[in-house]
């Protein structure tokens, strides 16, 4: 057995070590075990149940491989070095467990508390349902209540889920390759144990069995890779190094995605952002492969960042690997993208509360931050000289310059001419491929990931596929409704060792894919893939024409407020920081489920808002904790409000977990990068409104979310009154002028009793007198009186009526 296989089997034992808890809670029958000594020595029922699972589902692995899995049974009573490694990994991973004070037996019901229910000192009773992972409201969103309400039903729910888990694991019985076995089981564990608490009887049940098991697996792999003996595991001290926590940051992502001309950019933007998502995962996979580590050692990957656990003996490999990744990125993108790698060793003590928070701070502030100040610092002198010494091109020739990204035409490269309105657009081969990727995403039924050999030398990159192939992964977006052999959907299979298939459309038939892939080991992967693409992948001006009122497109950017603070300090309770690796992984995964899995559902008609926004919005990026969306201007604030309301429900109404956003508007010729910058500035204004942030900036004004529904209501009422109910159009302009006068006085620190007070009363009284519709007349008078009240009580309608009026003016403006 080679070292890599032994490392994978250690991870497999770690992944399975507590699977018996799942069976135990479901009252699943145990397999009859003939070895009476084993029954006696295993000691814990869940360990016995885990041993039973191995016997039932790992029969095709070799006898030697199954012996390496003995830690599943004996991690509480080790008999071998392999058992000791699982025991230590379990103990370190369980460092997250926070004792439950004063719990009575009837409170100890095994439901998982939402990761958000206890952040920042909040203490909400919110629990996840026991359901197979799906990106549906009924599955993802927590329910409020006391676990005792479900104490009579939980065993039936567990048994139902266990039966589905066993059925999904049946293919494991036919797998003899430990690498394929591990990856397959890893996916099934995600699907079925993401919602199950690792511990609950004497602990706060806020860490899932999935997160605890994968961290145990990752640590067991590190210990096996470092060849830690049983004696070492038993004798290890508090300051002994156990593993290395590595962070990778692909720098240059924002400029790569958004610094584009408007001409034709809409059709390439989604492809570019999705390429970055794929590239992050592919680079992380490359790092794991080169370090000889299994997928369980990837803590998180998304949005240009990844975290992984490596063995202590791998430290000397990290710098050369960082250099190699950056060399390949530079070959592909000429320095626009590069990898910044940083790491910190983790001692045994770092895994225990409260010390992990300090290790997390050390990784970012003392390692990553200085490294980011040395861009391309990982490159060797020769590689740096080659990059700096490359000719920059002649410049100035628009006929041979890409209209979208500005790249000059290379020798032998075919530029594609096209039209964007009245403007001629020339596209380089890479931008053509990004446009094709965006179009393929809109119609794909499956994402296929093929693990292939890493080329010794990276190839020149003229397509997104080649950029990924340089790291040993071939990716295809497949539409199984069309013959695969005709549309060349599947890349070359030569050298492919493993295929991962993700369903984009749940009901799509996978049989054509199975036939096309032949005998290549195939794994079904559950992964969120945020998809919100209007039919035909419209241009920006086409989106603008779908607006109500003025023809404008716009950009919406949103992200979670104070995310770094949430990770660093969010788990502090009673003067102790309870941040651990498992909690960090769980929080990251929960955010990913919302932004990548649930978010697209919010464009469909909602219970309290029947408007369908799918034809007006084009989601460019959603992942980690943020989103970037292009759309018809009038749909953007409506969608932003839906996101905020849904996020508040998803995060258990925790007032300390919020998000802010900014919206910019643009016409057809406005550059995308400028619209993106404007939206970013608006988002910054929203975050700067108050200490709590939790706001949206729109049309030049930041508004707290708790006031936004009233602003929207007033805006649409005003537009309707002037268009259909006989109110004079001067009403809107009058309100804009009143708000401007108030704002001028406010800046002079004289917000009360200014000229605006009597002007507003006089003019709005005259407007009301001219209106015949009774409801409109009463509405105008109500606004007048609310503004008048601001003389005596600061705030209220006067703060936001100007925004509502500007919004109404744009809604009412005739199409140009």
Features from the language model and the residues they span:
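Charged, helix-rich terminal subdomains or tails
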Residues: 1-303, 309-816
């Amino acid at each position: 057995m080679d070292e890599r296989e032994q490392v994978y089997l250690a991870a497999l034992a770690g992944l399975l070590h507590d699977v018996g808890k799942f069976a135990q809670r479901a009252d699943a029958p145990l397999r009859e075990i003939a070895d009476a000594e084993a029954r006696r020595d295993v000691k814990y029922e869940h360990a016995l149940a885990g041993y039973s699972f191995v016997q039932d589902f790992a029969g095709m692995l070799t006898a030697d491989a199954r012996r390496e899995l003995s830690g599943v049974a004996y991690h509480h009573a080790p008999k071998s070095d392999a058992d000791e490694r699982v025991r230590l990994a379990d103990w370190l991973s369980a460092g997250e467990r926070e004792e439950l004070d004063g719990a009575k037996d009837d409170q100890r019901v095994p439901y998982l508390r939402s990761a958000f229910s206890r952040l920042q000192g909040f203490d909400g009773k919110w629990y996840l349902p026991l359901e197979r992972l799906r990106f549906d409201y009924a599955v993802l969103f927590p329910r409020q209540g006391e676990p005792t309400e479900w104490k009579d039903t939980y065993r039936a729910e567990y048994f139902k889920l266990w039966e589905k888990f066993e059925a999904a694991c049946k293919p494991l019985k036919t797998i003899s390759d430990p690498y394929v076995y591990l990856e397959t089981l890893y996916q099934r564990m995600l699907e079925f144990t993401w919602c199950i608490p690792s511990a609950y009887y004497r602990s706060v049940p806020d860490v899932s069995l999935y997160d605890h098991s994968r961290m145990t697996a990752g640590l067991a792999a590190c210990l096996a890779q470092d060849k830690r003996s049983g004696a070492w595991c038993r004798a290890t001290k508090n300051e002994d190094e156990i593993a290395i926590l590595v962070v990778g940051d692909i720098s240059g992502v924002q400029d790569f995605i958004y610094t584009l001309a408007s001409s034709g950019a809409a059709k390439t933007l989604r492809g570019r952002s999705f390429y970055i998502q794929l590239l992050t995962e592919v680079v992380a996979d490359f790092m794991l492969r080169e370090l000889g580590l299994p997928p369980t050692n990837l803590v998180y990957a998304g949005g240009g960042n990844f975290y992984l656990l490596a063995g202590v003996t791998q430290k000397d490999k990290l710098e050369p690997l960082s250099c190699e990744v950056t060399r390949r990125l530079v070959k592909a993108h000429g320095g626009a993208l590069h990898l910044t790698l940083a790491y910190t060793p983790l001692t045994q003590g770092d895994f225990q509360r409260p010390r992990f928070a300090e290790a997390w701070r050390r990784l970012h502030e003392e390692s990553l931050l200085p490294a980011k100040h040395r861009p391309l610092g990982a490159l060797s002198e020769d590689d740096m000289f080659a990059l700096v010494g490359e000719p920059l091109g002649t410049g100035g020739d628009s006929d041979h310059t890409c209209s979208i990204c500005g790249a000059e035409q290379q020798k032998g490269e075919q530029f594609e001419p096209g039209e964007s309105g009245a403007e001629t657009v020339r596209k380089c081969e890479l931008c053509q491929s990004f446009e094709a990727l965006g179009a393929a995403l809109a119609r794909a039924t499956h994402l296929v990931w093929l693990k292939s050999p890493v080329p010794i030398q990276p190839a020149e990159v003229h397509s997104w596929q080649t950029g990924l192939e340089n790291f040993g992964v071939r990716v295809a977006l497949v539409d199984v409704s069309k013959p695969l052999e005709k549309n060349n959907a599947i890349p070359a299979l030569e050298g492919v060792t493993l295929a991962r298939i993700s369903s984009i459309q749940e009901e799509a038939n996978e049989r054509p894919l199975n036939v096309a892939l032949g005998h290549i080991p195939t794994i079904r992967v559950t992964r969120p893939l945020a998809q919100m693409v209007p039919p035909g992948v419209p241009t920006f001006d086409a989106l603008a024409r779908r607006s109500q009122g003025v023809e404008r497109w716009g950009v919406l950017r949103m992200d979670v407020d104070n995310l770094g603070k949430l990770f660093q300090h969010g788990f502090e309770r009673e003067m102790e920081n309870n941040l651990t690796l498992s909690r960090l992984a769980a929080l990251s995964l929960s955010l990913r489920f919302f932004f990548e899995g649930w978010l697209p559902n919010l464009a469909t008609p909602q219970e309290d808002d029947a408007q369908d926004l799918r034809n007006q919005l084009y989601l460019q990026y959603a992942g980690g904790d943020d989103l970037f969306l292009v759309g018809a201007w009038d749909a953007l604030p409506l969608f932003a409000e839906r996101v905020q309301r849904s996020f508040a429900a998803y995060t258990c109404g925790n007032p300390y977990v919020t998000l802010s956003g900014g919206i910019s508007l643009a016409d057809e010729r406005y550059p995308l990068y400028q619209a993106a910058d404007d939206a970013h500035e608006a988002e910054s204004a929203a975050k700067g409104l108050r200490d709590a942030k939790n706001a949206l900036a729109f049309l030049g004004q930041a508004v707290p979310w708790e006031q936004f529904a009233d602003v929207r209501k007033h805006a649409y009422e005003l537009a309707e009154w002037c268009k259909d109910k006989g109110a004079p159009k001067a009403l809107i302009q009058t309100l804009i002028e009143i708000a401007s006068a108030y704002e001028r006085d406010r800046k002079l620190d004289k917000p009360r009793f200014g000229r605006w007070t009597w002007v507003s009363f006089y003019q709005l009284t005259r407007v009301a007198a001219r209106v015949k519709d009774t409801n409109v007349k009463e509405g105008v008078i109500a606004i007048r009186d609310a503004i008048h009240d601001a003389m005596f009580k600061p705030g209220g309608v006067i703060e936001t009526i100007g925004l509502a009026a500007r919004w109404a003016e744009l809604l009412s403006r005739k199409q140009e």
